[in-house]
């Protein structure tokens, strides 16, 4: 493992030039202190976890110090926000500090969020608050532990620097890791500003660095787009299967790698509600839980439009046509596993849909239902789960069909509990748990953030003394309004 001064840098994106980003130095925050760090994220950089306790760690990730090899850059891009095109966005408070090359040949972006004003800040102050920084840290690491593709969070650094949102809050900086920070909106920017040469440079960069397996295809650009469609189909299937709501699926928040990116007012479902809206600014429900599938397709269509400079329209349409069937296949596979099924039958999707309809009629905690279902043999588990449902007749009919379906599975029930517990988390990042940790951190106590982080890194394992993190949320905890303010 390495010390901070032993990291190897290779700043590939910065070398593309000033048409793609602007060099900006971070603006330090006062009295930097470590709030929380992820050992597993540090391992991606080959960093010794003990480095997080050193004063220089907080200094480097709060803008007070820079590596000599760093080349901090604010990236330019545009995007569709709530369906309307915004021609010039860019990193308004984030900087791509550098790209680290680890010992297995992987490049990881070090991205500092809350680093101060940039040419793309518009009217913003360039800062991030402690509240939103903790939320992104916890979500990144929780999704990773669930097996959902995501950017990672290295650390959160707190400060005494005041910032104003709805009230006075304190500034913080989050260091995000990803193998690329290129978004759908990067391609839209060069397309709509009619810069085909720069767009081709960017496309070639992404192809060479992130989709090398597509280089030898008959049509490399089309092969890359098709792979992006495939990755997003699997990503959204995992979101839906685990009840994750992103909240702000603008095209500038969509990663070219097909990973969860740019967390805002996200939430995991508590009681199942297909129409759940986690962003209180989304008054029309554009980014509701149920709409995430069609919106992902819409965003891919926006990306396809931006790529019409290098790919013919008809092949792009054909590639887009892969999204829904791929999504459905991934989603059904995940839901079969969540139900403990190891084989496929034609009526399995109908079985899943009927269950969700029963849940929708009220009162059923989405995550805990699947966990309970695997605790005991099927007939006994159904009796226990029944108490949570309002539509008892509907659930009884579903339960009878589910029991019959389980009896058609090959072999005996040996290992069913272990199989189901391996895919059905006991611990999920509920908004009220995050809020309690944030309130403690805002009072200067970081122990709850760190404890919650540790619990969420092992979501499928029962952890002694952590039962409180596996409970149904209190009523007040189910209806927390989360805004884009960060």
From Swiss-Prot:
InterPro entries attached to this UniProt entry: SelO (IPR003846)
Its Enzyme Commission number(s) read: 2.7.7.-, 2.7.7.108
Q: Where does ATP bind?
A: 90, 92-93, 113, 125-126, 176, 183, 262
The cofactors named for this UniProt entry are: Mg(2+); Mn(2+)
Organism source for this protein? Pseudomonas putida (strain ATCC 700007 / DSM 6899 / JCM 31910 / BCRC 17059 / LMG 24140 / F1)
What are the binding positions for Mg(2+) in this chain? 253, 262
Which major enzyme category is it? transferase
Q: What is this protein called?
A: Protein nucleotidyltransferase YdiU
């Amino acid at each position: 493992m390495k010390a901070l001064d032993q990291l190897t840098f290779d700043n590939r994106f910065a070398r593309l030039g000033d048409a793609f980003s602007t060099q900006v130095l971070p603006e330090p925050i006062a009295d930097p202190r470590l709030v929380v760090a992820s050992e597993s994220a540090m391992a991606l950089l080959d960093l010794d976890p003990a480095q997080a306790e050193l004063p220089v760690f907080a200094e480097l990730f709060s803008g007070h110090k820079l590596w000599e090899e760093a080349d901090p850059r604010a990236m330019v891009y545009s995007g569709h926000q709530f369906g309307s095109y915004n021609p010039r966005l860019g990193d308004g408070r984030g900087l791509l500090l550098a790209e680290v090359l680890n010992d297995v040949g992987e490049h990881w972006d070090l991205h500092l969020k809350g680093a101060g004003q940039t040419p793309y800040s518009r009217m913003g102050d360039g800062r991030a608050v402690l509240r939103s920084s903790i939320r992104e840290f916890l979500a990144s690491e929780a999704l990773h532990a669930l097996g959902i593709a995501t950017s990672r969070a290295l650390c959160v650094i707190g400060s005494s620097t005041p910032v104003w949102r709805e009230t006075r809050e304190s500034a913080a900086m989050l260091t995000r890791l990803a193998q690329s920070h290129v978004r759908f909106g990067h391609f839209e920017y060069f397309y709509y500003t009619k810069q085909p040469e720069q767009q081709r440079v960017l496309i070639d960069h992404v192809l060479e660095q992130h989709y090398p397996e597509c280089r030898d295809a008959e049509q490399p650009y089309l092969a890359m787009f098709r792979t992006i469609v495939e990755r997003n189909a699997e990503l959204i299937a995992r979101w839906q299967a685990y009840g994750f709501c992103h909240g702000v699926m603008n095209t500038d928040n969509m990663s070219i790698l097909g990973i969860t990116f740019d967390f805002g007012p996200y939430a995991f479902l508590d009681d199942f509600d297909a129409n759940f809206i986690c962003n209180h600014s989304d008054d029309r429900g554009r980014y509701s839980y149920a709409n995430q599938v069609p919106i992902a397709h819409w965003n891919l269509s926006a990306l396809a439009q931006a790529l019409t400079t290098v790919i013919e329209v008809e092949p792009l349409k054909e590639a887009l046509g892969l999204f829904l069937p791929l999504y459905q296949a991934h989603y059904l596979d995940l839901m079969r596993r969540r139900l403990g099924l190891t084989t496929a039958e034609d009526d399995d999707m109908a079985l899943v849909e009927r269950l969700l309809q029963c849940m929708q009629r009220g009162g059923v905690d989405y995550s805990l239902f699947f966990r309970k279902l695997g605790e005991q043999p099927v007939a006994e588990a159904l009796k226990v789960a029944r108490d949570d449902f309002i539509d008892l007749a509907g659930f009884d009919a579903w339960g009878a069909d589910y029991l019959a379906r389980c009896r058609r599975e090959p072999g005996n029930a040996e290992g069913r509990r272990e199989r189901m517990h391996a895919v059905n988390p006991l611990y999920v990042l509920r908004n009220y748990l995050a809020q309690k940790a944030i309130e403690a951190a805002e009072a200067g106590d970081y122990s709850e953030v760190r404890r919650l982080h540790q619990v969420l890194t092992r979501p499928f394992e029962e952890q002694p003394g952590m039962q409180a993190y596996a409970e149904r949320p209190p009523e007040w905890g189910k209806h927390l309004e989360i805004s884009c303010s960060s």
